[in-house]
Amino acid sequence: MKNKYIEQFEAKQIEGKNVPDFRAGDTLKLAIRIKEGDKTRIQNFEGICIARRGNGVSETFIVRKMGANNVGVERIFPIYSESLESITVLRRGRVRRARLFYLRDRRGKAARIKELKK
């Protein structure tokens, strides 16, 4: 059982954020606020969500994309991070797992995920 002050603090951190509903297999576009010196800029990161873990303020998710020369790039983001400007769901993926770590071993067409039909 958590302390009531910690619960109040966490609720205050969560209430201002508008996080879309997404799960593993979805293709996301993240707008990340990057501070370089005294300037800030927005950098986009687009990839497949391969895992979500935790709950509350400490919830995180892993996004994987194929970078230059087919090098896989994975980044872990806290969902309620101040540096995340926005999260956009581009495609819903049809997967049967909650953790898609097997995509690390796949290349090219084998790494594709079917789109969820509505």
Swiss-Prot record:
Annotated family: Belongs to the bacterial ribosomal protein bL19 family.
GO cellular component: cytosolic large ribosomal subunit
UniProt-recorded Gene Ontology molecular function terms: structural constituent of ribosome
Domain of life: Bacteria
Keywords carried by this UniProt record: Ribonucleoprotein, Ribosomal protein
Biological process (GO), any one: translation
SUPFAM superfamilies: Translation proteins SH3-like domain
Pfam families the record matches: Ribosomal_L19
UniProt function note: This protein is located at the 30S-50S ribosomal subunit interface and may play a role in the structure and function of the aminoacyl-tRNA binding site.
Organism the protein comes from: Campylobacter jejuni subsp. jejuni serotype O:23/36 (strain 81-176)
Gene: rplS
Protein name: Large ribosomal subunit protein bL19
Record flagged with keyword Lipoprotein: no
